[in-house]
Swiss-Prot record:
Residues 1-20 form the signal peptide. This is Centrocin 1. Residues 21-50, 81-104 form a propeptide. It comes from the Eukaryota. The modification Asparagine amide is found at residue 117.
Length: 119
């Protein structure tokens, strides 16, 4: 069980370090060492671990919301339809080839951004 938790935390650590750069690496490494050595035996350690986990999840969630909000605003500025967005991007960047911009991809990314942002 502890190995599964350690693997999940490794994935969380990698995501957190990419998304929320203000999390200290040493804090993450200490937690992973604690899990691998199976020293989480006292109730105090478990409470500390739960508190750290909640803070980490909140930081990742907030970073994701910021990214989704930014992407949603950018899609809104470009236009709500994929055709409008594609036309505006090509207008802003004339050196870009039309084949590089697929309307389906633009629509899909804008749809994801709007869905994550709650619009």
């Amino acid at each position: 069980m502890m190995i599964k938790i350690a693997v999940v935390l490794c994935a969380v650590m990698a995501t957190t370090m990419v998304r929320a750069k203000y999390v200290e690496e040493q804090e993450l490494a200490d937690l992973l060492d604690l899990l691998i050595s199976e020293e989480v035996s006292s109730p105090d350690d478990a409470v500390a671990l739960q508190g750290w986990w909640r803070r980490t999840v909140d930081k990742v969630r907030n970073a994701g919301r910021k990214v989704a909000g930014f992407a949603s605003k950018a899609c809104g500025a470009l236009g709500h339809s994929p055709q409008e967005a594609r036309a505006k991007v090509l207008e802003a960047f004339p050196e870009m080839k039309e084949a590089d911009l697929d309307e389906e991809d633009i629509g899909k990314y804008c749809g994801y951004a709007h869905a994550l942002n709650g619009r």
